[in-house]
Amino acid sequence: MAGQGSQMKKYCDCCKRYVDHSNGKMKCFHRQMSANFEHSMIIPNKFLDQFGGKISRTVELESPKGNVYVVKVSKHMNKTVLQCGWEAFVDAHQIEENDSLLFRHIKNSRRASGVQERNADPIDVSSSTHDDTVQSSGGERFARSESGSDSQHSKTAKLAATCSSGGSECTGEEAKESSSSEHESSYDLVDPQIAPMPGYVLSRGTNLSQAHEEKLDMLVQEIRPEIPLYVTTMKHSNVNSHHASLVIAKHYACAYFPHTSQTITLKWHGKNRKWHPKFYIRKDQVGYILHGRWIDFVRHNHVKEGDICIFHLKNFNGRKFRATVHLLRETIPHSFGALHIPKRFESRNGRMRLKMTDDRRVSSTECRRGTMEPSTTNVKKEADNEQCNNGQGKRQEPLNFDVSVGSSKPYLTADRVSLTEEQFMKVEENVHSIQSEGPIYVSIMNKSNVGTDGLYIITLGRQFAIRYLPEGEQTLTLLTTGTGKAWQVKMRPRSGDARMFTLGWRDFVRDNRLQTEDICLFQLTKNSERGLAMKVHIIRHNERS
């Protein structure tokens, strides 16, 4: 790039303008926004040294117009992270991947400001270093933030980060060091296996289905681990040999496991019993292995190949190393046969049919006295990874509802969901009585939906979501018939264009006393006063006749 040398000199001069040699502490730092930067940003530990290694729980970022962005500070993987609220700040300033931010601590004002540059172009000093600082309430001071552009390829902005004590700025070398040695700007860090959302680390070769990912996300929210969870899929060598062992990923073991070979303590979630496998570190420091009584842990808890073990580590005090293990069982698509359920309705190719033990079709006389033909009922199947055991659903064409076909209004169910004859009749009856102008989504409550296994998650499938639900995170109002009560539920996108209910869904479940095998009919309604809303019709499993 022409003039790159002179522009880089301006960049260095910008940093040197804030030099404070009194204590040699980092007074500013530089960050280049990498993948997933919009979710979080890490503050270098050296920058925190000037505040005694600590910073307040929240920081405020203030714009030139006086808009204040409150950002939560949290600890993950021994890193201090700007998280909740950071995304709003990023959006407001139109920060993009590969933009660079220079954060500085402003002398005598307890402020930290930053300069943004597009595509790592040098900073325009003249438009990014003037003192535009303000006093803020609460005893902390911040710099204002502004953005502008002087060319098609560069953009400058003054950003802010909270500081809790006085001080001044940094040298150009410090800014450069913070960019190179602590360049992680998001949870990608150095290892691509570290999840974009904080809370867990996947071992190499571990791939989560959407259902497992949702359960894992909910587990992280429930226990809020101080140390990221370690998630690994069981292989044959881990569970099927008298000499079974488990290798812990090196980057994780080095960071969180003991630094010497020793016996550790494992607990099974929900049990008081303890197991004491040996944690062994090879002399060449390339292998970190659980063995010995590891096989006892596997056998006593019936851990199988394909299961996913989640290690929740406790803070290591140097003497006893402890971890609690949660398990996600390998899920296999159900095969409904004569030994379990002799007669069920299945969704196939957009039609419903009755599945018998010999897999024969039945005539309409075998259903509701000949008043209905199951093979022509207008029910569409829907890919719903949360309901589908293996987390996979086939891609489907856009739905075409034709209310003239069959005896009921159209509705959607999860792909591979199986309704008993009793369930099918009850759903048909309720859908017919609702007379909805809009689509209805049918979901049979399982343990994860109603909190039986400690989780409260529910997913609406892809086809329903992409056709009828807005993109992005939304606040949804859930209503029930006859109560007049409303619940505000957060709905966020999942992989594969599905949608998941998060905050607020637990309250809905508890207030309505939902149980496994209850059926919920989600009716999308037009309610301008409440915005996006659904009326939920509940069919109790113990009330079906």
UniProtKB/Swiss-Prot annotation:
<keyword id="KW-0805">Transcription regulation</keyword>
<dbReference type="GO" id="GO:0003677">
    <property type="term" value="F:DNA binding"/>
</dbReference>
<feature type="DNA-binding region" description="TF-B3 2">
    <location>
        <begin position="231"/>
        <end position="331"/>
    </location>
</feature>
<feature type="compositionally biased region" description="Basic and acidic residues">
    <location>
        <begin position="173"/>
        <end position="186"/>
    </location>
</feature>
<dbReference type="Pfam" id="PF02362">
    <property type="entry name" value="B3"/>
</dbReference>
<keyword id="KW-0804">Transcription</keyword>
<feature type="DNA-binding region" description="TF-B3 3">
    <location>
        <begin position="441"/>
        <end position="542"/>
    </location>
</feature>
<keyword id="KW-0539">Nucleus</keyword>
<dbReference type="InterPro" id="IPR044837">
    <property type="entry name" value="REM16-like"/>
</dbReference>
<dbReference type="GO" id="GO:0005634">
    <property type="term" value="C:nucleus"/>
</dbReference>
<dbReference type="InterPro" id="IPR003340">
    <property type="entry name" value="B3_DNA-bd"/>
</dbReference>
<protein>
    <recommendedName>
        <fullName>B3 domain-containing protein Os03g0620500</fullName>
    </recommendedName>
</protein>
<feature type="region of interest" description="Disordered">
    <location>
        <begin position="111"/>
        <end position="188"/>
    </location>
</feature>
<feature type="DNA-binding region" description="TF-B3 1">
    <location>
        <begin position="26"/>
        <end position="119"/>
    </location>
</feature>
<keyword id="KW-0238">DNA-binding</keyword>
<dbReference type="InterPro" id="IPR015300">
    <property type="entry name" value="DNA-bd_pseudobarrel_sf"/>
</dbReference>
<keyword id="KW-0677">Repeat</keyword>
<feature type="region of interest" description="Disordered">
    <location>
        <begin position="368"/>
        <end position="400"/>
    </location>
</feature>
